[in-house]
Swiss-Prot record:
Protein name per Swiss-Prot or TrEMBL: Methylthioribose-1-phosphate isomerase
Organism name: Enterobacter sp. (strain 638)
Gene of this entry: mtnA
Domain of life: Bacteria
InterPro entries according to UniProt: IF-2B-related, IF-M1Pi, IF_2B-like_C, Initiation_fac_2B_a/b/d, M1Pi_N, NagB/RpiA_transferase-like
Active site: D228 (proton donor)
Amino acid sequence: MQTLQTTSLRVADNQLFILDQQALPQEKRWLDASTVEALVGHIHALRVRGAPLIGLSASLLLALLAENGHSRDQLAVALDTLRASRPTAVNLMNNLDRMKQALWQEDFVPALVTEALRLIEEDKQLCDAIARAGSQLVKPGSRLLTHCNTGGLATAGVGTALGVIAHAFAAGNVNNVWVDETRPLLQGGRLTAWELGELGVPYQLITDSMAASLMAKGQVDAVWVGADRIAANGDVANKIGTYSLAVLAKFHGIPFYVAAPQTTLDPHCPNGEAIPIEQRDAREVTGVAGSFGAVQWAPENAQVYNPAFDVTPAALISGWVLDTGVVLPEAVEQGVFKSSAV
């Protein structure tokens, strides 16, 4: 396969490398992800993360394994293993469905390579389209609040919600971005703050619990988040804490927008209750670890509830910004997401 580079993925010498997102921002470190076991380990540890990026990394790995001599049967097993690595992220399932179709073509090796590269290019185009559509909703002088990380680190392109923010900033319409730290793994404080700094976008970092105070003081004009899965009724699964922000935004009369590509839609999932929610390791809540070392602050035997995602009901969402344009609540109520052709 040709040499390839995105913000978080690299292909060189027919090997896949991922940017270690657990080491950022202190260290920019590339890790080998050239086996199924390695990539699944990176996904579980969130060294590679973001629904679009997970699907793209899995697709690239399958193509590289095919080029490196794996049989069709071996690739089928690898595909199923990768599919199970992150159950909430529907982009992974959608991408692997396309790779599975390529796998069963007669000349499956070039078919897999072509499909993986096509997915990368499509994601870049989807991100650009989302940014253009969403930036039309950002008014001059806006102070925006965002959650988790939805930029180039999570996609092959400019990102989803963060791509909208960057595009709107380039148009002169963003005065400030409130970045909530996004407990427990601090994707906002570590990754979004880093990306905004690289882009020159003015931001202020806050703890998650400060959002309500800012909204009450009139300091937030809109909330922008991404999505890991959008159900047929418009319910959205996203990083834990998204639902809290949606409730707060609704109470304070603040627009709450979800930015995602069509690959995040799941027309076969009727509502948020049907979305599987991953439960993660208690140690993510009882302490923190990074390139600086590890610290534990909770009692040794503390019982922990640690879902990776929550579900935001469609009734709390002002608009779903897709690569095809902005979808308003009225269209969702009429069933627009029940068909994959939005």
